[in-house]
């Protein structure tokens, strides 16, 4: 039985006690990863309680029904003593009719909350991990891996390779991304999303995903999203069409050297029929050279409303799948450390015999049950050396031997820094560098090995294109003819002599 003013006082006290608990929790040293995760879950729970108390307090201060205003007026009026004794009488009557009712102060409630926090068994209900996840240190993607193996027309990988490449979905052609593929991506995203919430409860994941959504919409409108860009495949080029400058060609035979796909793309761009043999396509395209109007007989039929509707549905389906892939890229980036640790853990388990794995599991369970305060201490690492498979810093001589003290910066990868020459050389074949080259419109071939600057890559690509253009077969200069006397001349000279009647 509380008045509005008493409720406000109680909520203010509750907020102050919650703030004190959060400060104490934040200042407490966390000896290991398990304690850190539990501490962040406790902080999140306290923040939610603080938010709820603040919302209730704000509603009371808004006083939409004017009850608070009326209560203050009654206490501050001329009959304040009569009001006081009337309320005291109500309180006595309430406890007389409810003798078992006990008012528990907030201090007792918070003491009980602190006792629960200090008991690990009671706090284990806040977050749970499987045995494979190792208390939040490793990923358990076995179920997702089984779904991946059941996908048709995808490369079959072992589990370790899958761990390091499950986000390389841009390498899968869009034609193979069917309903089963979408179920696989949704399952993988659900697991990664839930895992991030368990190991990083204080992370503003909704804000991160909102940024991903905005960035995806921008890339989709520009046609640059990985795996779905306009320049991604020849089929996409053929479907959208690309204009071709015919001024550089003097005959349809020269156009035929471009191939079926390029001719089809040019015909689609002009709205012409794109079927037929190579010669028919080349002749049809060459017949439009220098003409301002096109022959209606050469025009392609407009797609029906049914076909347009099917294309629209297919476009929306591709967009939904691409949106799921954008989330997958973000999840993989947030879990990069756990991903690398999972690979090392799986490799270490595969290198052991069955008996050694059982002994290791027993030792791990015993170490978790021990109360050694130094067991999970953060290792002494003043030089910020990388951690080995045992979770301890590697020796400094090994750090220098592998050249990990040398940093390599790659502008094509978005100014990403690689530690050591081995990681630097390996990254040219990895997804980050390949995606950067794809955004530049340059194939990631051996010609561009060790090229890290965007300007250098573009310059080299222009040079390679000019060399390829110079090596291109030119019929007028390289096609040879022989006259009746056995003289061998090129095509252009032969036609000039023929027109002049000198043959």
UniProtKB/Swiss-Prot annotation:
Q: Where in the cell is it found?
A: Nucleus
Give the modified residues of type Phosphoserine. 360, 365, 367
Annotated tissue distribution: Ubiquitous. In ovaries and testes, it is expressed in all germ and somatic cells. Highly expressed in spermatogonias and spermatocytes. Highly expressed in the germ cells of larval testes, while it is weakly expressed in fat body cells, in polyploid nuclei of salivary glands, and in larval brain.
List GO terms (cellular component aspect): catalytic step 2 spliceosome; precatalytic spliceosome; spliceosomal complex; U2 snRNP
Positions of the UniProt region annotated as Disordered: 296-317, 341-384
Q: Kindly list the GO molecular function terms attached to this UniProt entry.
A: RNA binding; zinc ion binding
A biological process term (GO) from this entry: mRNA splicing, via spliceosome
Q: Which InterPro entries match?
A: Matrin/U1-C_Znf_C2H2, RNA_Proc_DNA_Dmg_Regulator, SDE2/SF3A3_SAP, SF3A3_dom, SF3a60/Prp9_C, SF3a60_bindingd
**Which stretches of the protein fold into Matrin-type zinc fingers, per the record?**
408-439
Q: What is the deletion mutant like?
A: 'Noisette' means 'hazel nut' in French, and is due to the small size of testes in mutants.
Q: Where is the composition biased (Acidic residues)?
A: 358-377
Which keywords has UniProt assigned to this entry?
Answer: Metal-binding, mRNA processing, mRNA splicing, Nucleus, Phosphoprotein, Spliceosome, Zinc, Zinc-finger
Entry-linked Pfam families: SDE2_2C (PF13297), SF3A3 (PF16837), SF3a60_bindingd (PF12108), SF3a60_Prp9_C (PF11931)
Q: How does it assemble?
A: Probable component of a the U2 small nuclear ribonucleoproteins complex (U2 snRNP).
Q: What role is this protein assigned?
A: Probable subunit of a splicing factor complex required for 'A' complex assembly formed by the stable binding of U2 snRNP to the branchpoint sequence (BPS) in pre-mRNA. Involved in male fertility.
Q: Which PANTHER family match?
A: SPLICING FACTOR 3A SUBUNIT 3, SPLICING FACTOR SF3A-RELATED
Which protein family is it in?
A: Belongs to the SF3A3 family.
Question: What protein name applies here?
Answer: Splicing factor 3A subunit 3
What organism does this protein naturally occur in?
Drosophila melanogaster (Fruit fly)
